[in-house]
Amino acid sequence: NDLNDTYSLLGGAQAWIEFQSKKLDLSRWSRQTILPEVGMDGQKKILNATVAIVGMGGLGCPAGQSLITAGVGKLILIDGDIVELSNLHRQPLHGADDIGKRKVISAKESLEKINSVTAIKIVEDYLDEQNGLDIIRNCDIVIDATDNIDARQLIDRFSKETNVPMIYG
């Protein structure tokens, strides 16, 4: 059909520019939208998803990279830790210039360079009894990328209370 790219000029040039920018945005993920398991409907779900990553270290960094390149609409990064020299060989979102900086700030800066469309919220603290339930209840998925059992059990409990699926590594 030759009319697939036809667009009404109702709204003028501004509407056309907005239409074109959205069209270009979706082309970014064209390699995954051609997969029958994803398609355009699946990509729209990904673009509308909110994912929390608890821990921005050795598991959280690659998880964040994968999610942002897939086109997740909103990421919430939670970690109270600071980047140290010993982190750099296994946490690819942090560089030598980030030593002493909060991991969530460093990760956000790196992820925004990969995809500036995804909204990224940071929580410069560890997930705990006071903040955890409010953070997780507003997510579609929570990823446990922590390195201790107490945090994992807390995330698991909040996940069950809010019916938000938890993924852990």
Segments predicted by a language model, with ranges:
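Adenine nucleotide-associated cytosolic modules
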Residues: 2-5, 13-169
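Glycine-rich beta-alpha loop elements in corrinoid/cobalamin-binding modules
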Residues: 9
